[in-house]
Structure formats: structure tokens, C-alpha cells
């Protein structure tokens, strides 16, 4: 479990995060959304121990996040960044997935087994002997995910992990993320369509935590989304347009509208 209490972070004299309080349960998937500059990536860097916060407390798996405990906490957390090109230096897919394990003195037989297991999980087992530099952006990001999974962290952060990918590559990576179980998953994203698949959505706005609630509750509140500059999934945009039109024409069949909303919501979840 991750517990954050009264977290405040300043960059120079500017407050980037202001008195953040939230709890993320074990084996849950949360999405953190918000416009640019809301503090999403800053929060991720703090959780990784890359930035020291000014006030508050973070407890991860009953361990307080501080400089003394960083060597204990860092192996518990993995991160997938925006750009899949940042770490590749001419290795094969097999070598890249094995790289971190070799640094942790894992025995050769276990490395071979883990490489194959996680390559299959992200559907790149047919690419194991291919040079990573020859892969598409989506394939590279899947290699990154396999490398992180092979380290078996308890928490994985996806920091805009699909934003550099074409639509097909982004969809492939999103589907893989949805298959990961028994970990805390934190997806930082602008894509509310993708965020709607998670257990909870956390909204940050100008460094403040606005809400933490289930996607269906949040995404069916058009006034809230408009207030905090969030774009709803396309299927729900259609519902809002129909709702607006029905209001204009004074259509009062509320049950029909509710049924339509549920149909569009279920369609959104199945995409």
C-alpha cells in the first residue's frame, strides 16, 4: 500500500504539489490525470526517490520514504517512461530484458526462464534475437515493460508510456498494461479513455489533488470534466451531446437516457 500524507513539493519558490493526501491499495490500478503542469510526473519522481519533497510523509509497504530507506524501496518500484528510445544501446531484445537481472546477480537459469516468461507475456517472444534498435516504437515500449516485469517490482509507474507511440502501438501497450495483475499500477496519462479502465482516477489540478474516485463516477460528470479541462472518452462525448440535445428539445425519457449511458459506458470498457 502507498500512503501519502500532506505532501508538498516546491521547485525553487514555486509550489508544484500542495498538501497531497491519498492512499493507493495493494493490487490496484490507479490513473493520475490532469493538464500539463498539474504535478503528475513530479509525483512519480518523488515516489521513485528522484526528488526530495519539502513537507509531508510517504509510506510504501510500511516503509517510510526517506534517504535512509531508498536502497530498500527502489527495487520495489519500476517505471516506464514516455520515450522508449532512451535506454537502448544496440542490445538484442533478449539481452535488454536480461540486463537488469544480471546486475542483481540472478542465476543464469532463472534469467533465461524470466526472459522467456515476460517476453511471452508482452508478445515479443518471436523478437528475442532481434536488435532493439530495429523495432517499432510500440515494440520497444513492450521490451521496456518486459524488462521491468522481469525485475518483479511491487509497484509499476507508467509515465505517459504511450504518448510517443502511434495509435496502434499505443493500443497494444495499453492492452498489455491491462493484463498485469497482483501489483500496484500507476498510469500517468492524458487519455481518459485509457484511464477509464483503471480502478480509480486521481485528478490533479494546479498541484492540488481534486478527487480520487472510480472512473464511472467521475467520467459521467461532464461539468466536473469541463471545470478541470479533461476530455471524456469519445463514447461518453456522444452521450453528452445526446443529453444536451434532449435537454434543448425537452425530452424527458430519463430511463432511455440512462440506458443509453450504460450501453456507451460498457462499450467504452470493452475497447
Swiss-Prot record:
Domain of life: Bacteria
GO (cellular component) term, any one: ATP-binding cassette (ABC) transporter complex
GO molecular function, one term: ATP binding
Alphabetized SMART domains for the sequence: AAA
Boundaries of every ABC transporter domain copy: 2-231
Pfam families linked to this entry: ABC_tran (PF00005)
Residues bound to ATP: 34-41
Keyword Translocase: yes
Membrane topology: Peripheral membrane protein
PROSITE patterns: ABC_TRANSPORTER_1 (PS00211), ABC_TRANSPORTER_2 (PS50893), CBIO (PS51246)
Keyword Acetylation: no
InterPro entries from the UniProt entry: AAA+_ATPase, ABC_transporter-like_ATP-bd, ABC_transporter-like_CS, ABC_transpr_CbiO/EcfA_su, ECF_ABC_transporter_ATP-bd, P-loop_NTPase
Localization annotation: Cell membrane
EC number: 7.-.-.-
Keywords associated with the record: ATP-binding, Cell membrane, Membrane, Nucleotide-binding, Translocase, Transport
Protein function: ATP-binding (A) component of a common energy-coupling factor (ECF) ABC-transporter complex. Unlike classic ABC transporters this ECF transporter provides the energy necessary to transport a number of different substrates.
Complexes and interactors: Forms a stable energy-coupling factor (ECF) transporter complex composed of 2 membrane-embedded substrate-binding proteins (S component), 2 ATP-binding proteins (A component) and 2 transmembrane proteins (T component).
Similarity remark: Belongs to the ABC transporter superfamily. Energy-coupling factor EcfA family.
Protein name: Energy-coupling factor transporter ATP-binding protein EcfA
Gene responsible for this protein: ecfA
Amino acid at each position: 500500500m502507498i500512503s501519502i500524507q500532506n505532501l508538498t513539493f516546491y521547485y525553487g519558490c514555486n509550489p508544484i504539489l500542495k498538501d497531497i493526501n491519498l492512499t493507493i491499495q495493494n493490487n490496484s490500478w490507479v490513473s493520475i490525470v490532469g493538464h500539463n503542469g498539474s504535478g503528475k510526473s513530479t509525483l512519480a519522481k518523488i515516489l521513485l526517490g528522484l526528488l526530495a519533497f519539502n513537507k509531508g510523509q510517504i509510506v510504501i509497504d510500511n516503509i517510510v520514504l526517506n534517504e535512509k530507506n531508498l536502497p530498500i524501496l527502489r527495487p520495489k518500484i519500476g517505471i516506464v517512461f514516455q520515450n522508449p528510445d532512451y535506454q537502448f544501446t544496440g542490445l538484442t531484445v533478449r539481452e535488454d530484458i536480461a540486463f537488469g537481472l544480471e546486475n542483481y546477480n540472478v542465476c543464469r537459469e532463472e534469467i533465461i526462464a524470466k526472459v522467456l516468461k515476460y517476453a511471452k507475456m508482452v508478445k515479443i517472444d518471436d523478437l528475442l534475437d532481434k536488435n532493439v534498435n530495429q523495432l517499432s516504437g510500440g515494440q520497444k515500449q513492450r521490451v521496456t515493460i518486459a524488462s521491468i516485469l522481469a525485475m518483479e517490482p511491487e509497484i509499476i509507474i507508467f509515465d505517459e508510456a504511450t504518448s510517443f507511440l502511434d495509435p496502434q502501438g499505443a493500443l497494444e501497450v495499453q492492452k498489455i498494461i491491462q493484463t498485469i495483475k497482483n501489483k500496484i499500477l500507476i498510469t500517468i496519462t492524458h487519455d481518459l479513455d485509457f484511464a477509464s479502465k483503471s480502478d480509480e482516477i486521481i485528478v490533479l489540478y494546479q498541484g492540488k489533488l481534486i478527487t480520487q474516485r472510480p472512473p464511472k463516477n467521475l467520467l459521467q460528470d461532464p461539468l466536473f470534466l469541463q471545470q478541470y479541462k479533461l476530455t471524456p472518452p469519445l463514447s461518453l462525448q456522444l452521450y453528452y451531446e445526446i443529453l444536451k440535445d434532449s435537454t434543448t428539445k425537452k425530452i424527458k425519457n430519463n430511463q432511455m437516457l440512462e440506458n443509453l449511458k450504460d450501453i456507451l459506458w460498457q462499450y467504452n470498457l470493452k475497447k
